[in-house]
Amino acid sequence: MTIHYVDASAWAKLLVDEHESGALAAYVDERLAAGETFASSHLLVTELHQLAARVSAAPTDVTAVLSVLALTMPDAATYRAAGLLPGSVRSLDALHVASALDLGADDFVSFDERQLAAAAAAGIPAANPSNALGDST
């Protein structure tokens, strides 16, 4: 089973219409149809609800975009692992990378280059849906 770990920079594009939103939606649809899994940490729930409040999106929209994800709850070991990741990674980014490691994610889906670099440094291949689908961004 293929597991694609996603962060807020990616999944937010399913909530807010941005340039890469169409590419991400196509990427997700294609992989879900193939039986692949998208996953994230429960941190994403907070991140998306905060985003929704900032852009006046309905909480039901957040629930809808979260509904296709397998969500994991970071435990104390995940927090410790996040603190020990190499480089100077922002705290939430480190928690996402550590959560992806816990899940055994096959790749890390993000539009945040620093986040992708942190994932790659931890041994998780980076995935950028725009690049995968031939978008020029």
Which residues fall in each region the model found?
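Phosphate- and divalent-cation-binding pockets in alpha/beta enzyme and binding domains
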Residues: 23, 47, 117-119
